[in-house]
């Protein structure tokens, strides 16, 4: 193999550390650093390092220099040249670059792009919304009930992430970014996301576009002062590996975050060759991605590269040649700590040009990596806010920290400042003596939740319809009204549950029908207002998530959505130990539909005396009255597994679980013919309470209960429970699940149309003038129900 002549782009502590590690390799003959700093400057003829006075984004001069010096490997350090496309410039002249393309660098260059990528690839992160319009962002922020983080979309020199303490500060930050252009074009778009709480973790991962290998997990200290106080900085210190990152946690991060990220980038056409920096928050719900960078982190690099025992140059070559899987990466079992020394005043205004002096380091495991330094008149002087880092390795975190701070004492410059508590999270004695509590050992399984999402994704996607892609995992479901053919509709919403029918499902361990009930109870309430159901969202709450039960439930929801023609665009699965016991769960649904302004039902002005009431047959009890049903079953001494008294071919419970009939498509068929005046969904309250809900104040309804055959289930319930007829009428649908009001001259046509699409329809009553003391819905021939 020919000797490697490397061109390293950058001038920070990260670049000094990379150059130092590269120079340990026998493969390296020279490392040019452009522009470099006081630590990378040549210190003699034997030195492999040499600074080159070319800016990091002066691509023309960098390429010319590389060609002149026979450079055969380029390693960009900072983010700006990567985002600006440095990789492409060197690719065009045939020089391999250990860094991503401009397309892949969008993962760091655009917060909006990276968050959308996470959403597309089901990578766990904070809920978010992005905006290019200030007024829209302000309106959203005004509705937020959670603490937020506001992020400028583009690169903002590490200052574009703002964590407001109050809503007032949040509005001020938004105005500063989007209106006052504090970060210039970087703030043209913003991301507003939920503030996550927990411990942060940074993981640097080598990637060849397919294979990925991670360095030890590190923990940075962003705040300027001890105790994580003060303003944000570029990083005041770092240690690795961090004890909070257990092997199990790292396996989870690898399988749910890092590998899916590498795979997702390749699948989307911009594979990552280089370093993936993943910033994580360890929340009670599991690890969540805060950000991606596409280069070595700073000061993480200063802490983790000293732990790398393998040849860095060999690893980088394996990445650019797409054969990372062919080499082993060996990591020291030691610990590392890097303490950053900064100029007085940092991260605010600070002096440059102060002379730095160094005493001899007392331990061979201690190193100094320069950052904001330069050489002037033979002296090393300050040339930036973060001046240098003192790093040390030891057999424990405590040993590494002690050696690093001993090394800090050998560095001297005017107004030098550093934090005194680097690695305090690991050294906190309370952490060592107290039991570690996690979300999982409190009763909530994050892994189960993630597996549940994976199981139902394809089911959910099967409900796609024009206007909605039925993709889950985002902040909210989106529906495109125009794509669905609506121009200026009114939106109609409904929310409902299934009720105690769920207890029968639990008794039989049969959960695939109650999801249909959930959809039906919502969409039937929409269609009676003339609305076409467009989207549905479900809420499933339980004490401990049973994957089989929850998946079966969602299968039912999907069936219901398909019957109704609406898209399942999202939902919430809530695991609440202590609130639900013995496998119990509850469910709620919400549906949104659309109706043209002129087609809203009922149409009160169109009703008249003599209008006909048509009844559409129900499929049984549907979803109301189950508290009474269960009490009757209890009194009957039957079990839900007993043979059904009115159908010897099924169990009692199976018959009672027959789902609510969904009337949407047949009713929309006749609604669009403009012959329907109003409709009533017969739920709790029966005919006597639901039919009046569609009537104008001057009309009443008369319904003849002898015009249809009451299903056997209601006959059994009445007899087994000795239930008065008046209670039966006000509790159950008694065989009529939907009532439609039409003009007398349209009754036959309507019945024919509904029958042609599979409905059983009865002519059950008519409208009459209201009398002062009369019932709004009077049932005649009730005596027929006495003699079932």
Curated annotation (Swiss-Prot):
Enzymatic reactions: 5-phospho-beta-D-ribosylamine + glycine + ATP = N(1)-(5-phospho-beta-D-ribosyl)glycinamide + ADP + phosphate + H(+); 2-formamido-N(1)-(5-O-phospho-beta-D-ribosyl)acetamidine + ATP = 5-amino-1-(5-phospho-beta-D-ribosyl)imidazole + ADP + phosphate + H(+)
Cofactor field: Mg(2+); Mn(2+)
Enzyme Commission number(s) of this protein: 6.3.4.13, 6.3.3.1
Lineage, highest ranks first: Eukaryota, Fungi, Dikarya, Ascomycota, Taphrinomycotina
Source species of the chain: Schizosaccharomyces pombe (strain 972 / ATCC 24843)
PANTHER family reported in the protein's UniProt record: TRIFUNCTIONAL PURINE BIOSYNTHETIC PROTEIN ADENOSINE-3, TRIFUNCTIONAL PURINE BIOSYNTHETIC PROTEIN ADENOSINE-3-RELATED
Name of the encoding gene: ade1
Tree of life domain: Eukaryota
Protein's UniProt name: Bifunctional purine biosynthetic protein ADE1
SUPFAM superfamilies referenced in this protein's UniProt entry, alphabetically: Glutathione synthetase ATP-binding domain-like, PreATP-grasp domain, PurM C-terminal domain-like, PurM N-terminal domain-like, Rudiment single hybrid motif
Annotated signal peptide: none
Region (GARS): 1-430
Binding positions (ATP): 141-202
């Amino acid at each position: 193999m020919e000797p490697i002549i490397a061109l390293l782009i950058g001038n920070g502590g990260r670049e000094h550390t990379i150059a130092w590690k590269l120079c340990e390799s026998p493969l390296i003959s020279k490392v040019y650093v452009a522009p470099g700093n006081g630590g990378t400057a040549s210190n003699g003829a034997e030195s492999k390092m040499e600074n080159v006075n070319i800016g990091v984004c002066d691509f023309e001069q960098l390429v010319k220099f590389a060609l002149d010096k026979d450079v055969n490997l380029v390693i960009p350090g900072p983010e700006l040249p990567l985002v600006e496309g440095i990789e492409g410039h060197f690719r065009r002249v045939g020089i391999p670059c250990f860094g991503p393309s401009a397309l892949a660098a969008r993962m760091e260059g655009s917060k909006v792009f990276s968050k959308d990528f996470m959403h597309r690839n089901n990578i766990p992160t904070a809920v978010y919304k992005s905006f290019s319009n200030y007024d829209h962002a302000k309106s959203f922020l005004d509705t937020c009930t959670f603490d937020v983080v506001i992020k400028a979309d583009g690169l903002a020199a590490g200052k574009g992430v703002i964590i407001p303490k109050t809503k007032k500060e949040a509005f001020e930050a938004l105005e500063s970014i989007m209106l006052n252009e504090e970060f210039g074009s970087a703030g043209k778009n913003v991301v507003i996301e939920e503030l996550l709480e927990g411990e942060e973790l940074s993981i640097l991962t080598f990637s060849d576009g397919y294979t990925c290998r991670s360095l030890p997990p590190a923990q940075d200290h962003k705040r300027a002062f001890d105790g994580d106080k003060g303003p944000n900085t570029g990083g005041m210190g770092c240690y690795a590996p961090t004890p909070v990152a257990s092997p199990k946690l790292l396996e989870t991060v690898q399988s749910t975050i890092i590998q899916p990220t590498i795979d997702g980038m390749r699948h989307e056409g911009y594979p990552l060759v280089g370093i993936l920096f993943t910033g994580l928050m360890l929340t009670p719900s599991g690890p969540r991605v805060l950000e991606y960078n596409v280069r070595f982190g700073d000061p993480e690099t200063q802490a983790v590269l000293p732990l790398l025992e393998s040849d860095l140059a060999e690893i980088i070559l394996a990445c650019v040649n797409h054969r990372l899987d062919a080499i082993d990466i060996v990591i020291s079992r030691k610990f590392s700590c890097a303490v950053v020394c900064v100029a007085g005043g940092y991260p605010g205004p600070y002096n440059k040009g102060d002379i730095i002096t160094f005493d001899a380091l007392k331990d061979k495991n201690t190193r100094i990596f320069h950052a904001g330094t330069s050489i002037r008149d033979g002296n090393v002087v300050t040339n930036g806010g973060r001046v240098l880092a003192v790093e040390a390795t030891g057999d424990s975190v405590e040993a590494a920290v002690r050696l690093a701070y001993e090394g800090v004492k050998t560095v001297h410059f005017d107004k030098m400042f550093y934090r005194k508590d680097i690695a305090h999270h690991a050294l906190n004695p309370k952490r060592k003596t107290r039991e570690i509590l996690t979300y999982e050992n409190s009763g909530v399984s994050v892994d189960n939740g993630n597996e549940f999402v994976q199981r139902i994704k394809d089911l959910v996607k099967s409900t796609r319809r024009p206007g909605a892609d039925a993709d889950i995992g985002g902040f909210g479901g989106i529906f495109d009204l125009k794509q669905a053919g609506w121009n200026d509709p009114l939106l109609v919403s409904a929310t409902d549950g299934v009720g105690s029918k769920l207890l029968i499902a639990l008794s039989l361990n049969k959960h695939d029908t109650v999801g249909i009930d959930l959809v039906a109870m919502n969409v039937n309430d929409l269609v009676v207002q003339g609305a076409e159901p467009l989207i549905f969202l479900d809420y499933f709450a339980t004490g401990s998530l049973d994957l089989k039960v929850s998946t079966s439930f969602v299968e039912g929801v999907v069936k219901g959505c398909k019957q109704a023609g609406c898209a399942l665009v999202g939902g919430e699965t809530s695991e609440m130990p202590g609130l639900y016991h013995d496998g119990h769960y509850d469910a709620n649904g919400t549906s949104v539909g659309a109706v043209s302004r002129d087609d809203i039902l009922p149409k009160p002005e169109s009703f008249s005396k003599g209008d006909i009431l048509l009844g559409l047959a129900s499929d049984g009890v549907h979803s109301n009255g189950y508290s009474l049903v269960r009490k009757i079953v209890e009194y009957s001494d039957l079990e839900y597994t007993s043979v059904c008294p009115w159908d010897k071919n099924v169990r009692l419970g199976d018959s009672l679980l027959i789902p609510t009939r969904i009337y949407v498509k047949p009713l929309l068929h006749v609604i669009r013919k403009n012959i329907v005046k109003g409709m009533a969904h017969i739920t709790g309250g029966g005919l006597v309470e639901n039919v009046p809900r569609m009537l104008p104040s001057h009309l009443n309804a008369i319904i003849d209960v002898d015009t249809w055959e009451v299903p056997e289930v209601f006959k059994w319930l009445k007899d087994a429970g000795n239930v008065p007829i008046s209670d039966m009428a006000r509790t159950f649908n008694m065989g009529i699940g939907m009532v439609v009001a039409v003009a007398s001259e349209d009754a036959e046509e309507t019945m024919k149309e509904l029958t042609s699409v599979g409905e059983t329809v009865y002519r059950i009553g008519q409208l009459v003038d209201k009398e002062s003391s009369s019932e709004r819905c009077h049932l005649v021939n009730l005596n027929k129900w006495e003699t079932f």
